[in-house]
């Protein structure tokens, strides 16, 4: 991304149902940190999505909950402690 002039990358709020704080993703976040590349976390595969189809609930409840799940995973797993200069948006 950096080589072609991009300033950030996007990742889903989970990868194949794995939280972003899982150890196999640490190298990705450390690399983004060292290159100064921002990471945009986009809600993906919302938990409980099939049960909340009415009233725009997937967008009003599901996406914020999924984003919170991803960020909490990064915080509580220690990724943000290990990658202190990582920019998440």
Task: Locate each region found by the language model.
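Catalytic pocket-lining loop regions of alpha/beta-barrel enzymes
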Residues: 2-89
């Amino acid at each position: 991304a950096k080589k072609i002039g991009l300033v950030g990358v996007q990742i889903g709020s989970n990868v194949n149902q794995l939280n972003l704080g899982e150890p196999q993703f640490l190298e990705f976040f450390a690399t983004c940190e060292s290159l100064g590349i921002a990471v945009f976390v986009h809600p993906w595969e919302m938990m409980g999505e099939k049960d909340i189809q009415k009233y725009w609930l997937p967008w009003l409840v599901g996406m914020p909950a999924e984003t919170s799940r991803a960020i909490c995973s990064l915080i509580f797993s220690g990724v943000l402690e290990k990658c202190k200069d990582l920019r998440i948006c």
